Amino acid sequence: KDVKMRTFITQDNERDDLVAHVYDITYGTIRAGVDNLVIIDDSIVRGTTLRQSIIRILDRLKPKKIVVCSSAPQIRYPDCYGIDMSRLSDFVAFRAVIELLRERGMEHVIEDVYRKAVAELQKGDRSETVNCVTEIYDRFTDEEISAKIAEIVTAPEIQARVEVIYQ
């Protein structure tokens, strides 16, 4: 794809407009309310393109269910597969575990992990640094996180049930 059409590498202020105009579908390819629609995504990082464009477009076909299969595992941390983003909150997997923690009354875990991460940064020897954020993910199964990601990438007006499956 031309770099101007790559929604992932587009600047933040231009991404929302671009994702609404890059993709389209072939109508009449499935039986409305009967067929499930399976798509493959190379990776789900922010979830923006899925939520604001792809799932909306696919929902126009009125499938019974949309299954999004990611050929990559859940992208949970910066600098994974060359993805270098500075804010954990940009990652849909991170937003999913934060929502799960809040839903289950476990907000204290967020503060505990934050304190541990700050303490790690203050250590003199960075060669022994521990990624404390893993503790946030460890409280949930991959399936629980994937189910929450499916909720996040599904806009309220979507009629089809959406499921997200990772490699």
Show where each model-derived region lies.
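PRPP-associated nucleotide enzymes
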Residues: K1-Q167
